[in-house]
């Protein structure tokens, strides 16, 4: 019989007395009331509720005692934190099993047999990380440091969970010839594959830059189907995979499969630390075959999902209607994530992003758009401006506050003497603009950028104060279009139709609420600006 981990010690994520107004506290991005958080786990939409589980340390703001925290929402914006779903076994004494990253499904056909009295079981598949050698109730012997794949189930909509101790782990070791990789075998992403009527799970052999694809009839017994990799970027370990299906916009009859994959370290050019890449291809229920255009020679390039430093461990929702795909990522970076100056919590999640495939500049590309429920916290303080020409230099704007949504567009141009070399909006700026975060466009290199070199506190890491950039072409209307989400300690930028994004944390002073436009070396033409203030999702 398993254990009801959610009730252990009565641990609640929500702490009394915290009102989500601490310095740097995100107002419309999820963060736990207190303690350490990293990867999103077990993203599941079921019975009208979005479940967000996450890697969580119940003991403090450092990584450790890995458990699954739990929050729910009806709109992906307003979140309620629940008791810990899967508490590190043995905590607060000697921990014998930690619950590393994984995913969750609603087993609507009760293939697992866990459902009783007509209740649909929710089944989580996760990596059991064992710090000590031990013999398990299932009769399996564990080596210290081993990582294996296990399952747990819930019959009360995710409030309490029972681990499947009779047989866990259900995938004990990596298959031959990879047995030696038992310490780097993790992060199962599980989903129902309708065409073959089977469950599919994708795990990583992290150090070998390989994915293993498994299939099952019942979530309990798994067979190896195929493997994938190494391809493209292999600068660090491969982690946190997803395998998702998306139609190509404009031709609904063409559906492709996409692998989204974390890499740590070895993120996008110009960043240090972790990042997220993707592959587009086909999946037949057994094998993923990447499209030739999705593979680069020499492991020197990749299809980056986000070109900023703070987008990692992107996870996909199971159970969404209409084939929708929404992902949430950890808005942090292993380079400095344990040092960021927040208290009593550490780390936040990205805004939820709706994924699609579109043909951009002749290539099928993964496109991200912010899930539109952010509008539920937009306030009525809207600033709208348009200029035929913004003069060289600085144009001060009314203060948009500490949290806002910005839509900025302007005409592209080639380098001319009278026209700007770069154009940017400065946000979270001090009154003298010595502290500011710049989001803008370089007309010479045709790149969008986020410049956090003067964004605020960067004392905790020598690599933090950096300018990040990536290519962005003008749209068919010859305009550059930017969507910018500003929160108390982050900016997320979506360029064009969403074919590029850059996500970056910032830690400005409390009173840094000013904004301005900066047109360098000349004028910028046909500028349109809309700024919506954002209310707190917590009040």
Region spans (language model):
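Beta-rich accessory regions
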Residues: 17, 250-252, 282-539
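Cleavable N-terminal signal peptides of Sec/SRP-targeted secreted and luminal proteins
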Residues: 1-17
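Short glycine/serine- and small hydrophobic-enriched flexible loop segments
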Residues: 244-245, 318
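Short acidic/polar alpha-helix capping motifs at helix-coil junctions
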Residues: 4, 32-35, 316
């Amino acid at each position: 019989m398993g254990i009801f981990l959610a009730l252990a010690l009565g641990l609640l994520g929500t702490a009394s007395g915290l009102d989500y107004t601490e310095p740097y506290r995100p107002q419309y991005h999820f963060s736990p009331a207190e303690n350490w958080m990293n990867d999103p786990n077990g993203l599941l939409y079921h019975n009208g509720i979005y479940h967000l589980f996450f890697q969580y340390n119940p003991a403090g703001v450092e990584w450790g005692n890995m458990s699954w925290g739990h929050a729910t929402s009806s709109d992906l914006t307003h979140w309620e934190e629940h008791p810990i779903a899967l508490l590190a076994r043995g905590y607060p004494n000697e921990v014998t099993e930690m619950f590393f990253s994984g995913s969750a499904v609603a087993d609507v056909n009760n293939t697992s047999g866990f459902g009783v009295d007509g209740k649909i079981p929710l089944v989580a598949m996760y990596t059991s990380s064992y710090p000590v050698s031990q013999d398990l109730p299932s009769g399996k012997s564990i080596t210290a440091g081993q990582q294996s794949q296990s399952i747990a189930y819930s019959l009360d909509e995710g409030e309490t969970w029972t681990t499947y101790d009779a047989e866990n782990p259900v995938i004990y070791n990596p298959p031959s010839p990879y047995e030696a990789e038992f310490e780097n075998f993790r992060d199962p992403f599980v989903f129902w594959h309708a065409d073959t009527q089977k469950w599919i799970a994708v795990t990583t052999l992290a150090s070998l830059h390989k994915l293993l694809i498994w299939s099952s009839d019942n979530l309990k017994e798994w067979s190896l189907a195929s493997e994938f990799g190494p391809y493209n970027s292999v600068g660090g370990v491969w982690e946190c995979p997803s395998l998702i299906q998306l139609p190509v916009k404009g031709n609904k009859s063409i559906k492709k499969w996409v692998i989204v994959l974390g890499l740590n370290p070895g993120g996008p050019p110009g960043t240090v630390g972790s990042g997220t890449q993707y592959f587009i291809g086909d999946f037949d229920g057994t094998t993923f075959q990447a499209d030739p255009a999705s593979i680069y020679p020499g492991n020197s390039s990749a299809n980056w999902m986000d070109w900023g430093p703070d987008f990692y461990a992107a996870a996909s929702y199971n159970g969404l209607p209409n084939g929708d795909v929404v992902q949430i990522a950890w808005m942090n970076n292993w380079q400095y994530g344990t040092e960021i100056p927040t208290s009593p919590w550490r780390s936040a999640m990205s805004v939820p992003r709706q994924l699609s495939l579109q043909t951009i500049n002749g290539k099928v590309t993964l496109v991200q758009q912010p899930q539109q429920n952010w509008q539920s916290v937009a306030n009525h303080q809207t600033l709208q401006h348009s200029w035929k020409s913004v003069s060289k230099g600085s144009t001060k704007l009314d203060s948009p506050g500490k949290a806002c949504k910005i839509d900025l567009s302007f005409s592209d141009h080639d380098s001319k003497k009278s026209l700007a070399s770069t154009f940017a909006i400065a946000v979270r700026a001090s009154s003298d603009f010595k502290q500011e975060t710049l989001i803008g466009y370089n007309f010479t290199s045709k790149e969008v950028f986020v410049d956090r070199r003067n964004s605020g506190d960067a004392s905790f890491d020598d690599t933090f104060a950096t300018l990040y950039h990536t290519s962005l072409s003008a749209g068919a209307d010859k305009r550059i279009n930017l969507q910018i989400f500003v929160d108390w300690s982050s900016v997320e930028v979506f360029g064009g139709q969403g074919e590029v994004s850059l996500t970056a944390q910032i830690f400005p002073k409390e009173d840094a609420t000013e904004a301005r436009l900066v047109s360098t070396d000349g004028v910028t033409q046909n500028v349109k600006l809309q700024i919506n203030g954002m209310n707190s999702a917590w009040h």
